[in-house]
Amino acid sequence: MNTAHAQTPSQLSNPANAVGGGTSDVWRTHAFTFDDAHGAADLTDREWLLTNGTGAYAMGTVPGCNTRRYHGLLVAAATPPVGRIVALNQMLERIDVDTSAGRKRIEFGTCMFHAADTGQVVFVPAGHAHLQSFENGLNVRWRYVVDGITLTRQLMLHWKRQSATIGYTIVGLPTDTIRAVLHLSPMITLRDFHSLLSHSNAGAFDVRAVADGVCVTHEDDAVTLTCEQGAFETESDWWYDIWYPRENEREQEDGEDYFVPGRFSVALTPGECVAVDVHVALGELAAPRESKESDCSARNRHLHMIHRAIETLDDELITRALTVAADNFVVDRSIAGQTLSTIIAGYPWFADWGRDTFIALPGLMLVTHRFDEAKRTLRAFAERMRGGLVPNRFDDYDDSAAHFNTVDASLWFVNAAMRYVQESNDVSVWQDWLGQAVCDVLDAYECGTDFAIHMDDDGLIAAGSPDTQLTWMDAACDGVVFTPRYGKAVEINALWYDALVGVAELVARYGEGERAAHYTSLANRAKRSFRQLFWNKKHQWLNDCVWLDERGHAHVDATLRPNQILAASLPHSPLGESRRKAIVDAVREHLLTPYGLRTLPPNDCNYHGRYEGSIFERDGAYHQGTVWPWLIGPYAEAVLRAGAFSKKARRTAHEAVVPLLKQLCGDGLGQLHEVHDGDPPHHPGGCMAQAWSVAEVLRLLRLIAQA
């Protein structure tokens, strides 16, 4: 029997109901209490996330054990927002208590191990057996109770720094205690977060004493740990074969070795509440000791500003959770000496992708009134524009490099730019540089640019070849392109038409009548061709893609996919009212699930109902039936537009997003996943925190509120 108990939303919304007494974390959205060890052990699939505005993060599970290679108490960004290094994997805590009855050794941490011969999962040490409560909010907090002794561990990341603090309080030592010592043993890999460490080929770790602590160096990276309340004792050791079940499920290498350089030892005094802080920082310099309180205050002020912009969109618990969730993805990025902004596509493994950034920007930045960051994000990608293309993504390791293999990122850039100007009324930035960047995109698409992106004679955009993957359905593995969508893709041309009409209106407003007339002419041509090429009279939905073979013969892919929903959801649609309604009906009947839209209907012969297995198997399912939560935004907006924003349409749109809100405030621990299985019960998968999933929920809630 699962003996974990989650508090209800009404309980959580009242800080007085905090587990174990009051809490100062007003952003707390989740709390669990446990009756025994099984309750905690059953929650190894519940993951929490902390971020700090730089691309650094901390991530782990409710019981405290790591189940992925990407988990750690500090995964720092060596070259923000990328270059992620696992600086501190875990901390093992132990209290030795000497009383008149003898010595008692109490373990609090835990790791997972897997017996290959029997398949048995073992927790060592079994610290999770003492876990009484867990809280998730701006910080994460575990509370352990053993024989009247209470140890509380709280983790916080330092705002805009590559550092963290792990704070402990210990109370309740036996009155006949002769001697009690807290031992804290850091477990370290100091490796790229995509890789794994093996003792056999790890190379040497250098352990060097510093004031109040230790500096550990491995190859080109270092981490410094300090603790004013204790002394560090060097005693190097290794823990072997830590097991990562989530890697095992993905059919990846699933074991790792941890280096332990020694331990901090802190003398405890009976009858007192003892507080101990361990500061962790990437590099050879210790974390500033004053940063814990100042960073907490700065982050709180920052979050309150965001919350004020969205607090009327739903109830208090939901808007608090959305405030923190939305903020997790907005980070700094340095471009040409300027501190600009960008959006991390997803945690733990994604960096900032152009497509994801500009789909997510309206929800994460405009709905939340973060107009300065929105402007800096548009600038970051405009600065790297090449041939009218914004980057598909920045390189993870070379800060000066960018990759441009996308046909839709630039059109989403235009979409985000138009929305930014509309909502911020920032005329000066449009006239200074943004308007020109937007027009550069449209002109490049019209005249032709890289990756065979060009406007055809019919006014529609064609792109790519059989060997390229330029749309968001871009999965390929071992030379297999799973969703070939070269030629004229339906959502690309819906975005193209919307961009032409919207930009024509903007440039006309600012005195560029000739350019406005030209874009309007292109839009009219595209509209006529779109209706002729994409409307499928037989099925009463839109064709997904049309392309020419090497002999010039046209091929039509009439597969029902969610891409067509953009032709019904964007502000400027090339379709009439009846066809927009028909699209909504087809998508609702065949693709809609509680957690988003399927990428294929279940009756399609290429449908994959489970997103699982090896990389090849997962890539094969990625856009072949897998559900994407972000698509709930375009779907619900199409519902609103098809229903003329009526009361019934608003109710239907809100009903569509309710399951995701429950996921956010329930099993998602304040986040929304990248994908879900196409088949019920629609298990979540991919990244546990995805920017556009959160962003589209926020954008939709405001659309409904303003309707």
Q: How would you name each of these model-derived features?
A:
Residues 391-392, 446, 453-456, 497-611, ...:
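Catalytic cores of carbohydrate-active enzymes
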Residues 172, 197-200, 268, 274, ...:
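Aromatic-rich carbohydrate-recognition surfaces in CAZymes
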Residues 1-314, 348, 355-356, 366, ...:
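Terminal accessory carbohydrate-recognition/targeting modules of carbohydrate-active enzymes
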Residues 259-264, 340-357, 397-410, 478-494, ...:
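Solvent-exposed loop and edge beta-strand segments that line ligand/cofactor-binding
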Residues 183, 289-310, 318-322, 369-383, ...:
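Extended, well-ordered alpha-helical scaffold segments
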Residues 302-347, 376, 380, 464, ...:
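Conserved oxyanion/phosphate-binding beta-strand-loop segments in alpha/beta enzyme cores
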Residues 466-484:
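A short, charged helix-loop
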Residues 115-139, 146-150, 447, 585-595, ...:
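Non-catalytic C-terminal accessory modules of carbohydrate-active enzymes
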